[in-house]
Amino acid sequence: DDDTVIVHPSERGRIKQMLLKIGWPAEDLAGYVDGESHPIELRQDGWELRDYQQLAADSFWAGGSGVVVLPCGAGKTIVGAAAMAKAGATTLILVTNTVAGRQWKRELIARTSLTEEEIGEYSGAKKEIRPVTIATYQVMTTKRQGIYPHLEVFDSRDWGLIIYDEVHL
């Protein structure tokens, strides 16, 4: 039809930026793929999401994506776990270092139905790809002879959710 414009998926971001520059904000309704199913339940043994954590998880999910900004100690990891449970899919979590990655793993084991065997570590020390994989930014961005050998992790599974931890805007 004459009113339809087809845009190559790789150009979506650039077109949205150009429209914004001329004062036309664009709402991208292209949607997301569901990813590989992997059921995750939040445990409810002696704790529950705080109201603001539930609101953050619901808002993230309603928009299909987003950025969760909370102060230190407010439970961003728990909000991430709630988003994972809502997605019910394989998840890649990118963290700043292995200490943060192991904290994620401890919290996920304590607060969700995930077992140790379902959570992999992809770092300088280990290269485990599992239904939930926690990778460090450092290993993902390692470049050897002009090639990023570890970026294949992004394509190794049909990730239903990717969480970027400690992203500073």
Outline where the language-model segments fall.
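Extended alpha-helical interface modules used as scaffolds for assembling large macromolecular complexes
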Residues: D1-G35
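Conserved pre-motif I regulatory segment
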Residues: D34-V69
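Walker A/P-loop
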Residues: A62-A87
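Hydrophobic positions in the central parallel beta-sheet of the AAA+
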Residues: V68, I93, T133-A135, I162
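Conserved RecA-like ASCE P-loop NTPase motor core of nucleic-acid helicases/translocases
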Residues: T90-N97
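Conserved helix-turn-beta segment of the N-terminal RecA-like "Helicase ATP-binding" lobe
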Residues: T98-A125
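Conserved motor-coupling elements within RecA-like helicase/translocase cores
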Residues: S123-T133
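SF2 helicase catalytic motif II
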Residues: Q138-L169
